[in-house]
UniProtKB/Swiss-Prot annotation:
GO molecular function: DNA-binding transcription activator activity, RNA polymerase II-specific; DNA-binding transcription factor activity; DNA-binding transcription factor activity, RNA polymerase II-specific; myosin binding; protein heterodimerization activity; RNA polymerase II cis-regulatory region sequence-specific DNA binding; sequence-specific DNA binding
PANTHER family (alphabetical): CIRCADIAN PROTEIN CLOCK/ARNT/BMAL/PAS (PTHR23042)
Gene name in the database record: tgo
A single cellular component GO annotation: cytoplasm
Taxonomic lineage from the root: Eukaryota, Metazoa, Ecdysozoa, Arthropoda, Hexapoda
Composition bias type Polar residues, residue spans: 463-482, 528-554
Limits of the PAS domain: 85-156, 271-341
Protein name: Aryl hydrocarbon receptor nuclear translocator homolog
Predominant subcellular localization, coarse grouping: nucleus
Pfam family name, one: PAS
Length: 642
């Protein structure tokens, strides 16, 4: 019995010894893995303590990264053999559009900076070397940079809280240093931009990139640029790492011997470029609206147009700022923007400015869609000043009512309605037969269907037929012309003829211009008159030659009148009967001719020189060989008739 008890005790003791040995072995393994976890930066960066397998896997990956496995050649070199260290460094910095700098972690003193800082920040290499990095950082970013350079705990140095067990563990200074050594650092900060002459810079790409990410002058007048810095916390670099730059260590820096080796690159921000078209346009602003019309974003340029600040509009309904007469159709337009997803709409309306006046705005609106859900997130509106509408200025203070707007639009539209049926040669070009040129002298107006009034028909019956007075080279219908401005052109009815019209001598216009301004005008005999609404077009006056049959077969054009062809045949005894002195009907409105001081018979000026003698003086000008209109360079419609 006693022997059995003794054997049981020995067996139990040996079992306890084995368990103790296993427990000590497991504790040692855990300690080594924990120490390995402290040495691997990726493990220490995790929020929770990883398991042993994760620690071992991250440790292997970190060792491969340190050895450069897979990134080196067979001889272990990190660069091509034909490149020196300096050439490789310049190539890397040029490709990265950045600069290399080394900063002491404790003091923040710049112990090295590459010469590529000049095209990036407009500072020379000597401007940065030996200075504090915090002097080149925006004041609001200095605390963040100080945290990035710190390698020790600020208050609880050497004391680490284990979140899993809830206990506080004491760690030595070496453990904290091991935690920081090799740690990657990456941050974005605002760095000061210097005043180096840009003409000395070689890279134009960096200048454009600097304009893209420049934040502009701050309150103190200093320009800042957004710089993205990436690097590692390292021990003090050996003296041969930067052979061209001498680096001295302060006495205070001997305690930590760590520094930040980083590359600074310009960070492209969402700030609009200065050279981009429309980005600095002060006559437009951008707004963003919710689906109910509330302002969720307002560009600060709204102050220049409406007088509001963005904070005065945020959260308010946009319909409250529209003109009461525009609110209904603006709501319908916004509904269409929401229904037609992504389609651009152009709107014109009146918005109330801060001074209670209504300003015309032209808005291009579209709905922004969520790319994942394909649902409308918000409405984006680009609002521009609507001071120009149909090419004419709009006065916001004068055009408040729809009646005024409609009247103003009608004035802007080119609508020309003739008082009598006829053709107005003022808009469309008509090239005479045989003419090689097509200038502004021969223009015809756009025609529109319009029935003649009874008074106009009576006047037309008193006038000679168009078939008798049409010059050679043109053929018109003998019926009354039912056309006026605004309708289709009758050019299809004009057949070509082989006879070239004969122009009037150009000197006759300039010589008789003073007489044109003093005398009254005669009415048009063929029912073709000019439009009087536009000063650029010819006013009413003699369009065709008003002739008189004097001495039987002799016919002449009055000076200053335009005749497009030779005179009509002599066998037309009745075409000038109304101009004869005795016993014949007079024209409907007998007035003095604008080019002659002699009035027609029956006119207010009385009888003058016989018509045959007047026209015989001009016959010699019409007997020459017919020529084209290329020699006639006088614009007959440019003379201002009174």
């Amino acid at each position: 019995m006693d022997e059995a008890n003794i054997q049981d005790k020995e067996r139990f003791a040996s079992r306890e010894n084995h368990c103790e040995i296993e427990r000590r072995r497991r504790n040692k393994m855990t300690a080594y893995i924990t120490e390995l976890s402290d040495m691997v930066p990726t493990c220490s960066a995790l929020a929770r303590k990883p398991d042993k397998l994760t620690i071992l896997r991250m440790a292997v990956a970190h060792m491969k990264a340190l050895r450069g496995t897979g990134n080196t050649s067979s001889d272990g070199t990190y660069k091509p053999s034909f490149l020196t260290d300096q050439e490789l460094k310049h190539l890397i910095l040029e490709a990265a559009d950045g600069f290399l700098f080394v900063v002491s972690c404790d003091s923040g003193r710049v112990i090295y900076v590459s010469d590529s800082v000049t095209p990036v920040l407009n500072y020379t290499q000597s401007d940065w070397y030996g200075t504090s990095l915090y002097e080149h950082i925006h004041p609001d970013d200095r605390e963040k940079i100080r945290e990035q350079l710190s390698t020790q705990e600020s208050q609880n140095a050497g004391r680490i809280l284990d979140l899993k067990s809830g206990t506080v563990k004491k760690e030595g200074h070496q453990s904290s240093m091991r935690l920081s050594m090799g740690a990657r650092r990456g941050f974005i900060c605002r760095m000061r931009v210097g005043n180096v002459n840009p003409e000395s810079m070689v890279s134009g790409h960096l200048n454009r990139l600097k304009q893209r990410n420049s934040l502009g002058p701050s309150r103190d007048g200093t320009n800042y640029a957004v710089v993205h810095c990436t690097g590692y916390i390292k021990n003090w670099p050996p003296t041969d790492m930067f052979p061209n730059m001498h680096m001295e260590r302060d006495v205070d820096d001997m305690s930590s011997h760590c520094c930040l080796v980083a590359i600074g690159r310009l960070q492209v921000t969402s700030t609009a470029a200065n050279d981009m078209s429309g980005s600095n346009n002060q006559s437009e602003f951008i707004t963003r609206h919710a689906m109910d019309g509330k302002f969720t974003f307002v560009d600060q340029r709204v102050l220049n147009i409406l007088g509001y600040t963005p904070t005065e509009l945020l959260g308010k309904i946009c319909y409250d700022f529209f003109h009461p007469e525009d609110q209904s159709h603006m709501k319908e337009s916004f509904d269409q923007v929401l229904k037609q997803k992504g389609q651009m709409f152009s709107l014109l309306y009146r918005a109330r400015a801060k001074n209670s006046e209504y300003v015309w705005l032209r808005t291009q609106a579209y709905a922004f869609l969520n790319p994942y859900t394909d649902e409308v997130e918000y409405i984006v509106c680009t609002n521009s000043s609507g001071k120009t509408m149909h090419g004419a200025p709009l006065d916001a203070a004068a055009a408040h009512t729809p009646e005024q707007v409609q009247q103003q639009q009608q004035q802007e539209q080119h609508v020309y309605v003739q008082a009598a049926p006829g053709v107005d040669y003022a808009r469309r070009e008509l090239t005479p037969v045989g003419s090689a040129t097509n200038d502004g002298m021969y223009q015809t107006h756009m025609l529109a269907m319009q029935a003649p009034t009874p008074q106009q028909q009576q006047q037309q019956q008193q006038r000679p037929g168009s078939a008798q007075t049409t010059p050679v080279g043109y053929t018109y219908d003998t019926t009354h012309s039912p056309y006026s401005a605004g309708g289709p052109s009758p050019l299809a009815k004009i057949p070509k003829s082989g006879t070239s019209p004969t122009p009037v001598a150009p000197n006759s216009w300039a010589a008789l211009r003073p007489q044109q301004q003093q005398q009254q005008q005669q009415p048009v005999t063929e029912g073709y008159q000019y439009q009087q609404t536009s000063p650029a077009r010819s006013p009413s006056g003699p369009t065709y030659t008003q002739l008189s049959a004097g001495n039987g077969n002799r016919q002449q054009a009055q000076p200053g009148a335009y005749q497009a062809g030779p005179p009509p045949p002599p066998n037309a005894p009745g075409m000038w009967d109304w101009q004869q002195a005795g016993g014949h009907p007079h024209p409907p409105h007998p007035t003095a001719h604008p080019h002659h001081p002699h009035a027609h018979p029956g006119g207010p000026a009385g009888a003058g020189q016989p018509q045959g003698q007047e026209f015989s003086d001009m016959l010699q000008m019409l007997d020459h060989t017919p020529t084209t209109f290329e020699d006639l360079n006088i614009n007959m419609f440019s003379t201002p008739f009174e």
